[in-house]
């Protein structure tokens, strides 16, 4: 009883509450599991108006929402109403320091983190009105400078390079940095030569091309919606592992029957140049590729340290680009460009030298 009395009010933004002056809200103590920390929390659900058929409910607990300064329903920043990754990225660019929200990887650490009285990532800024206004002023100044100086200023060039070339440049740097890391023992255990519909009786699957912005709970919800049930996980082992640094993970069902049902619900597939099929799981605007994993997996299947995780993600990036018929950056890209420039200069000089006598003959 005391816990219910001392419990803070829900943290719900004005956009989710709507324009109605009076809203009837239903409170259910320990009514759901938090999508972030996985602990039970007090669930609230309501309608924005009496005529509305859409029921809005809280997805995360008050503690996790306060730590990240986000709405419990839409999970957007409470002040700016944008995704927390976009918020953190903007603040990092303006302040020239990393303020990204680091999420825990396993359930135990998620629960431990939720009990701390801290502000994570950009919540340190947007939870303070003066700090948030300061960031907005800095952003306005940057935009004003960009529009007033013209398209040839270093600011515009740097900004363009950041969005167009940052991903490729970082990948080339990582290829060089982690070139000596050996992950052959990891790759040989991955089912990369398996085909999606070849062995549908398995209950385990390998997931790759997982974007860093996709949380684990969203994959769980998508699978639950596909199957039409919530209790599909294997209670005796880890049913879902997502390693965001490696950009891959594993999915395990209670039975092979559920695995077959999952395969039948996947409508989109990809056929690689080698003739192998990949299932495609659509989440938001991203495509996660799926392969049956008959041997199963463990937490160590994706690497035991950060270096192995990143090297695995680079190897899978190459695989994805090969399967999609795309080219991928290599170490020699910049050198090849420089050699091309040097060669073109030499040819230009030779041509100019040969053309001078011809010009003199014409003028005589």
Curated annotation (Swiss-Prot):
Residues 331-364 are annotated as: Disordered. Pfam families: STL11_N. InterPro entries: Cwc2/Slt11 (IPR039171), Slt11_RRM (IPR034356), STL11/RBM22-like_N (IPR048995). Keywords: mRNA processing, mRNA splicing, Nucleus, RNA-binding, Spliceosome. Its main location: nucleus. GO terms for molecular function: pre-mRNA binding; U6 snRNA binding. Residues 339-364 have a biased composition (Basic residues). It comes from the Eukaryota. One of its GO terms (cellular component) is U2-type catalytic step 2 spliceosome. It is found in: Nucleus. GO terms for biological process: mRNA splicing, via spliceosome. Present with 4260 molecules/cell in log phase SD medium. Involved in pre-mRNA splicing. Facilitates the cooperative formation of U2/U6 helix II in association with stem II in the spliceosome. Binds to RNA. Belongs to the CWC complex (or CEF1-associated complex), a spliceosome subcomplex composed of the U2, U5 and U6 snRNAs and at least BUD13, BUD31, BRR2, CDC40, CEF1, CLF1, CUS1, CWC2, CWC15, CWC21, CWC22, CWC23, CWC24, CWC25, CWC27, ECM2, HSH155, IST3, ISY1, LEA1, MSL1, NTC20, PRP8, PRP9, PRP11, PRP19, PRP21, PRP22, PRP45, PRP46, SLU7, SMB1, SMD1, SMD2, SMD3, SMX2, SMX3, SNT309, SNU114, SPP2, SYF1, SYF2, RSE1 and YJU2. Interacts with SLU7. PANTHER family: PRE-MRNA-SPLICING FACTOR RBM22. Belongs to the SLT11 family. This is Pre-mRNA-splicing factor SLT11.
